[in-house]
């Protein structure tokens, strides 16, 4: 008797759904002119407005700053966006200080 488990075709890989912060980040960057970039605080504010409840304070966006950075790193590693320092793309695994982001240029 032969084992046919290796002959079965592989199921097509479906990309994992994006994190809601990543969706807002990509949507925000898509609205910018091609020569512009966004600060992480801009994206955190946009996401905070979606999540806002009447009892939330005006600094709600600060809760989401870390999530924005994590998703930006993830998207940069995947080649979907660029993380910029002084207007130049940087390694998403090794950057510090003030940074911005933009959609990956083709």
Put a short name on every predicted segment.
Residues 2, 14-15, 67-70, 77-106:
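Phospho-regulated, low-complexity intrinsically disordered regions of nuclear gene-regulatory
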Residues 16-41:
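Positively charged, polyanion-binding regions of nucleic-acid-associated proteins
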